[in-house]
Structure formats: structure tokens, C-alpha cells
């Protein structure tokens, strides 16, 4: 009997210890717990619905007013629904221009009923003071706001080194807003801990971010241990701005799930991924619904007997024009949008809904900029706009622009058929700020040698298939490349074209006038570092001196910077009014391509090896040396074997 009692006591203690270790245990006699979750990420200031092109079809999609309708319908069926957002809620439309004063995006997330969000890299676009001002403005509004979590900010390291002014601003704003490593929410009978993670690639994509961060997995593991120790929760969820990639070895949120297996659900933002089915990594479910509020993610989960959760249903609900917009939500969006006209567009003499041009041309979609390595008409019209605006600005000294450069990574939306408004043009190029502190990257004027221009073409030809944001579209320079040739030696022809279309050979040592946006100028200037010194592109002044601060070379239009989006708007307005209705018409010129970028797919051996540049010669030389070393090793081994015989 004593032995039986001891055995029972031992078993009881063992079960308690196991329950304590796992943090999860469900009483088999109880009904299993159930939770409905709605999620978004990468909304990028898309408060209003918008026209875009999807699979070659023009569609109206998105909009917080339609999202609100879907959320209301879901909450009628289950009032205890958890709503999560994966960050990058800002930067992408005109509403971002009042980011730091109105905090429109965060306030509207609160209005939707979002429970928890996190920070993405684009929340840092306006610098430390911009983020701090936005958080403070959100609190000052007095409105309902989502809780904000991020667990891997390394405050200890920053305190030890001494706060910079920007770090101090954000630290104080975090305290004011109540940003935490994690938060605990009760939904019906389900208690959920939600932590936030800021990914490694997000940090790489946030050049203005002054904060220091811990390794995401290590910080998440520590936070989960703290949750298990201090909170009696049923589920651990994570809003992560890290993303997923096709290559599982570098897919950050899949790595997070492997390294921190006690996380039940990861809402994965940053990479704009649209997952038709969740990614399952052990007992962790990873979900993504795509960008701009085009879809509302929904997942229903049930707790298993071991305390972990399984998916019952999962759906990405398209936010289409078939969904009725919630009127109260749209009214609030309109009120916030009105501040854009007053506080921002008045600086440029525009209004949000002003029509710039009528368009009958079918421009390529954004996705085609990733999938097609060729000339595209959207790149053509934007690069042509740069040339036009700079040559016609009030501060122009009459010098012609030789080349304008537009990378795919700076283009944020396409132009649809119908009226093109100021808002649509701004949304197509909505990134950054200038030295003047106003939203929008300015155009910069610089000089490159002919040799560097050819290198620009080679960046597109050799690198952009690995990094599609580096797909380059040029006005004034045409080139042909062969994708089958050796890397950094793919361009077979490169020349300039004037307004008359005549071919002009590029002289390697001559300086050429180049116009691009500030972001691209910085990107081209960093090519030397990114390529480990293999290739070099150094923006210069007209005397050939390297430019140290590109902001000082912004193109000015009177007393204000010429913003890239404003250059496009000016160009649109310059088109001929062909139907005589008082509004410009996009010309038929853009209905086709003009051999600006030509892919020569020849596999003829002569075409593949002719005209090798220094990179090809070096690579071939290395190959010959390597083969020689291998042959010497083989010869030596054979000689040794023969001696032993």
C-alpha cells in the first residue's frame, strides 16, 4: 500500500512538473477552446480603396472602409475575434504626408478594432523624430489605438553606449504609447500572449533607423520563456515584421518558428507574401495575406489536448468593390485625407483629386517589374518624366539631361486606364523625404562617366535577376544584354539616344549629365561596397569631383525641391489634349516599347564569348588557374601512385 501511495505521489508530481514545463495542458473533460483571428500586414497607408492591375485585369481593391465591413460581419458571428497586424502600416499613399502630425494609419487601425500591431521598417522612413512624433500624435488624439509590441529592441546596449538624441526620442515615445515586448489579451475563454519581432532584413531596409536590435530568435525565445513563467496563457502569437522567402534557409519567420517552437501562430509581414495555405513548422502556423489590404486574412483554430493549436479554417478574403464600404469609416478617412490638401499638397499647387491626364494606355503591373527582365512602359514614362521636368524647371541652366534612371524598387504602383489624379501619381512614387523635410524623394542632378553608364546597364543585366528591385529603366540610354553570357559581362551593346532618336556612342572618359531620385543616387553610390569593390559608380559634380552629400544636389524648382512624384505630375500635364476636353491625354507612344532594353537570347558560342570585358577576362583567368591547379594535383597523385607500384 505504501509503495502504491509513493507511486501515485511520484506520478502526480511528475504530471505537475510536465505541465509546468510545457506551459500548456488541457483537461480532457473540458470542451476544446476555439479562437477566430483576423490579420493584415504591409498596409502601407492604403486607407482608401485604389485602382490597380492584377493578372492583366484592372481592379478596384482594398480600403479600410471595406475592411471594416468584413470585420463587422465577422464580429457579428463571434465578438471574441482577435485582430492582428504585422507592421508597415505606413508609407505608400498621400496620407503618409501627415504621418508625423496626424498618425492617420495607426488611428485607423484602432478604428478597425485591431488589437495588436508591431513596427515595420517603413515606420522609420521619416527618421527617429518622425516615428516619435507619430506615436505621440496618436496618443494625443485620444482615440482607441492598437497595442504595440516589439521584443528585440536592445535598449540595454543603447543605454550602455549612451542614447543618441534620436534613440532618446523613440524611447520616450515608446513609454508614452506603452510599447511592450508582449501583451496579454483575453478573448472569451482564450487567453493569448502576443509578442512582436523586428526582422534582420527589415533592419537592412531601414537606413534611417537609429535603434539597435537583438537577434530576433534569441529575443523571442527569452520573451516566450518570460511569458511561460509569468502568464497563464492558452496561446502564444507573434506579429513579426521579418517575412518568408522561397528559400527556407533564409526565410526569417520559418527560422523563427524552428528556433522558438512554443510560438503557436506567426502573422508574417515585410515580404508582402500571400500564402494560399499556412506554412506549418512543427506546431507553429505561419500566415500572410499580401500587401495594401487587398485581402483580409482569416484563420480559425482549436486547441488540442496537448495544449497546442490546429487550424480549422484558413482563408484570404479578397477586398473587392463588391463589398460595401462602411460609411462611418469612409467619412473618418475623408476627414483625415482633407488634411493632406491643406498641410502638404498646397506646397506644390495641387489637390488630391485633381486630374492630371486621361489615359487609354495599358501600363504594366508592379508584379511584371519583378517577373519580366525587359523594357516596360511604366519605367519609360517615369524616366521620361524626370528628363522633362529637370529640363523645364525654372532653375534649369539649359543643360540637357543625357540619362534618367528609375529602379523598379522605387515604383510603388502603376497607372490604370481612365483619369490619372495627383493622388495616383503620388502613390506611384511615394517613398522618402528630402532635405526640406517634406515627404517625397527629390530628384538629384549628377554626372557619371561613360564607363560608369555602361556599368549601370550591367547592374541591371547581371544583378537584377537576383535582386529585382535593381531592375533599371532608362531614358536616353539603350542597351542590349545576353542573359546567357558570363555575369558582369552580359551587356553587348550600350549607347545614348537623343530626342531625335539618333544613336550616340558612349565615350568612356566623358562626363554625362544623369538625373535620378535621391534614393537611387544613394543606391548607385553604394554599389562599390555592395559588390566588394568589383564595380564602381561614383556620382560626381559637373567638374568631375565625387559628391559627398547627394542631398545638396537636389534639383530645385524655385525655392522648393523638385520631388520625383511632382516631376511625373508635371510631365502628365504637359501632354497634348488630343480630344480637346481641356485635359491632357497620355500619348500612344507609351503603348509600345522602343528598344531601350533588349534581351538577346542567342546561345551561339561566338556571341557568348565575344567582346569580353575585364570581369570576364578575370573570371576566365581564375578558371584557368583553378583547372591548372587541379591538373597539377592529379599529375602529382598519379606520380605518387606509380612510385608506390
Task: Label every PLM stretch briefly.
Residues 17-21, 194, 347, 396:
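Intrinsically disordered, low-complexity segments enriched in small/polar residues
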Residues 3-25, 625-633:
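Sec-dependent N-terminal signal peptides of Gram-positive bacterial secreted proteins and lipoproteins
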Residues 8-10, 29, 617:
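Intrinsic disorder/low-complexity segments
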Residues 3-7, 24, 265, 398-404:
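Generic signature of intrinsically disordered, low-complexity, basic-rich segments
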Residues 1-6, 643-645:
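Positively charged n-region of N-terminal signal peptides that target proteins for export
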Residues 5-6, 18, 23, 37, ...:
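Generic detector of low-complexity/intrinsically disordered segments
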Residues 27-322, 447, 464:
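Acidic, metal/ion-coordinating pockets
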Residues 31-39, 46-60, 64-76, 111, ...:
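Catalytic centers of hydrolytic enzymes
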